Amino acid sequence: MRRARTFVALALVLLGVATVAHAELPSGISRPDSERGLSQQELGAQLYAGNCATCHGIAGEGVLPPNRTRGAGNVRGLGPPLKGVGALAADFYLTTGFMPLQDPQQQPWRRRVEFTPKEIAAITQYVASLGPGPSIPRPDPSAGSVSVGFHLFTEHCAGCHQAVAEGGYVTNVRVPKLKQDTATQIAEAVRIGPNLMPVFSKHDISDRQLNSIIAYIESVKHPNDRGGWGIGHIGPVPEGMFTWLVAAVALVALCVLIGERLGKA
């Protein structure tokens, strides 16, 4: 009995140690020993040097190795130059968790945001200082029209993101859902074209039209399912499969019923 109790106690201790060790695993983010006393520019420079420079270069010139290694989205090099991308691109990739990448070969994908809002603002300011570029947009969906946004979204976006912004797969690339993106992140994505998404300039989609597109996306985040069940909200594919399933069950039941009656006759 005493040995059993000792074994159980030892197991609990080891489990506790393992739990603590797991909780203290580093996230892989390099931070200054103390962020206090650092100006925003200094903090951004140190965070950039520790987490971004390996792929994007010390001065944002990008990394283009002689062997022409290509990264995610077939981008030449480990990381593209950041000179001239402005605060817009940095804010988008950091607030969505697209960056930093654990592997330059993988497709950027929304994941847990690794930096605090203060750190994101610092890195964004530092990247913006590398060269003149676009600032963070300030969209106003309330000034847009949902009906106009629906037509614009159908024309420019639904081919990849589906009619109600549920995302999908296009040319071996996952297309993200838009329902968890903020208005600012949507506006940023439209202007920079992350991964395989095309870039839409203000000549292609004006700020006024962009407000309407965002207003439509906001409206489909909580759709009114008049039929009672949205079936995924991704269009005719699940609806057709559900219809065929119901029809197949009904036909089999009808065949069984007819067979039973013919057997009795």
Ranges and model annotations:
Residues 38-56, 143-164:
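Sequence/structural segment immediately N-terminal to covalent heme-attachment motifs in c-type
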Residues 72-130, 172-225:
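Extracytoplasmic electron-transfer domains, predominantly the class I c-type cytochrome c fold
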Residues 1-34:
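Hydrophobic secretory-pathway targeting helix
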Residues 49, 55-64, 83-87, 95, ...:
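Detector for the c-type heme attachment site
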Residues 19-24, 112-136, 202-264:
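C-terminal capping alpha-helices of c-type cytochrome domains
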Residues 1-10, 39, 237-247, 265:
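N-terminal export and membrane-targeting signals
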Residues 28-40, 125-147:
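Intrinsic disorder/low-complexity detector
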Residues 61-62, 130-144, 158-159, 163-173, ...:
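Inter-heme linker and motif-flanking segments adjacent to c-type heme-binding CXXCH motifs
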